[in-house]
């Protein structure tokens, strides 16, 4: 009985990962477009003081801009949203696949192979460079610098 409940719970968890509910009100919950895509009328069109158009022109321009942007976005997202989502899903799946099955194993392989070389390199440094720099340090340790301020 307990094993069946555990299996049902696992099935629900796996299902929840792939069938995530989406928020239809807040469609940018991580605020990725907060600073990037800000295209309200006031962000694009502005009249400086002293060069105002007629109030009616300003109101109609505002309405035209807002409505045309709204419907153009809706039309483009209707026509291209699903194909582009498919394209981006495929692209990110390919990138994830390459990262998981090629990049990470190559890096791990490189780190394993470079570890052997690093031991040899470290041995060479300790054998040749350490005595050389220790001797140079002894030679330079007897150098004295005197600073005088002349007026």
UniProtKB/Swiss-Prot annotation:
It is found in: Golgi apparatus membrane; Cell membrane; Membrane, Caveola; Cell membrane, Sarcolemma. It is a peripheral membrane protein. There is a cross-link at residue 38 (Glycyl lysine isopeptide (Lys-Gly) (interchain with G-Cter in SUMO3)). Its main location: Golgi. Sumoylation with SUMO3 by PIAS4 may reduce agonist-induced internalization and desensitization of adrenergic receptor ABRD2. InterPro entries: Caveolin, Caveolin_CS. Residues 64-114 are annotated as: Required for interaction with DAG1. One of its GO terms (molecular function) is alpha-tubulin binding. Pfam families: Caveolin (PF01146). Changing residue 97 to C: In LQT9; increase in late sodium current. Residues 1-83, 105-151 are cytoplasmic. GO terms for cellular component: caveola; cell surface; dystrophin-associated glycoprotein complex; endoplasmic reticulum; Golgi membrane; intercalated disc; intracellular membrane-bounded organelle; membrane raft. The keyword Cell membrane applies. Keywords: Cardiomyopathy, Cell membrane, Disease variant, Golgi apparatus, Isopeptide bond, Limb-girdle muscular dystrophy, Long QT syndrome, Membrane, Ubl conjugation. GO terms for biological process: actin filament organization; calcium ion transport; cardiac muscle cell development; cardiac muscle hypertrophy; caveola assembly; cell differentiation; cellular response to ionomycin; cholesterol homeostasis. Residues 84-104 dip into the membrane without crossing it. Expressed predominantly in muscle. May act as a scaffolding protein within caveolar membranes. Interacts directly with G-protein alpha subunits and can functionally regulate their activity. May also regulate voltage-gated potassium channels. Plays a role in the sarcolemma repair mechanism of both skeletal muscle and cardiomyocytes that permits rapid resealing of membranes disrupted by mechanical stress. Mediates the recruitment of CAVIN2 and CAVIN3 proteins to the caveolae. It is linked to HyperCKmia: Characterized by persistent elevated levels of serum creatine kinase without muscle weakness. Belongs to the caveolin family. PANTHER family: CAVEOLIN, CAVEOLIN-3. This is Caveolin-3. The gene is CAV3.
